[in-house]
């Protein structure tokens, strides 16, 4: 396996190998993206974007199984330095199903759409007072993001009141970053899993 930075010279090969269909944005912005592909047997099978302390990953429409997933993440864990362990954010449900059987989940991003709305404004830091707690969240034209994971909040009653608070304050959409144990309860409130962050060690 080897890592290649995606650029105008290899983007068409990458699109073909990964069986991508919606590619205009990728082609138009390839030189602005900090995206890398992984090649196995001279074919792209995977890509990732590095962030400060994790990578966001994609397998495109390439056929995968648990053997390939383990091989790729073992390779990356040995070749990328993230203080001893690799954190990987996964967005695709099929890949999530495989990852759930292989790795430990650190946190989960969930979302609920209330109504359509514009979210192209800057975020404002705000606080919700729930059960004697001041809970930080960010509001961008009524599109809400609240990191329950970083605030160590997993009490179902607090989460339910917070959800109600956001809806009553005309939220268009609500995004939470949650601890893994909260997923089932969040789904009962109508939230869907957007991504999971896994610990590769």
Placement of each model-derived feature along the sequence:
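Conserved acetyl-CoA-binding loop-helix of GNAT-fold acetyltransferases
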Residues: 65-78, 154-168, 188
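Active-site/acyl-donor-binding loops of N-acyltransferases
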Residues: 89-119, 175-201
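Flexible, charged surface loops at secondary-structure boundaries
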Residues: 29-32, 78-82, 122, 138-140, ...
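Conserved GNAT acetyl-CoA-binding A-motif
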Residues: 79-91, 168-178
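Short amphipathic alpha-helix that is part of the acyltransferase structural core
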Residues: 1-25, 111-132, 142-143
């Amino acid at each position: 396996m080897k890592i290649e930075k995606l650029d105008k010279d290899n983007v068409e090969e990458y699109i073909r190998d990964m069986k991508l269909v919606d590619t205009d944005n990728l082609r138009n912005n390839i030189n602005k993206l900090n995206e890398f592909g992984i090649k196995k047997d001279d074919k792209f099978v995977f890509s990732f974007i590095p962030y400060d302390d994790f990578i966001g990953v994609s397998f495109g429409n390439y056929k995968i199984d648990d053997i390939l997933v383990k091989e790729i993440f073992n390779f990356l864990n040995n070749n990328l330095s993230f203080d001893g362990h690799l954190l990987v954010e996964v967005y695709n449900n099929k890949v999530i199903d495989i990852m759930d059987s292989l790795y430990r989940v650190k946190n989960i991003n969930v979302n609920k759409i209330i109504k359509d709305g514009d979210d192209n404004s800057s975020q404002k830091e705000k606080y919700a007072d729930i059960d004697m707690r001041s809970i930080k969240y960010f509001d961008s034209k009524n599109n809400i993001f609240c990191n329950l994971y970083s605030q160590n909040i997993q009490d179902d009653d607090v989460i339910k009141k917070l959800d109600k608070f956001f809806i009553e304050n005309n939220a268009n959409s609500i995004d939470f970053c949650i601890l893994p144990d909260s997923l089932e309860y969040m789904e009962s409130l109508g939230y869907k899993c957007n991504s999971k962050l896994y610990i590769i060690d």
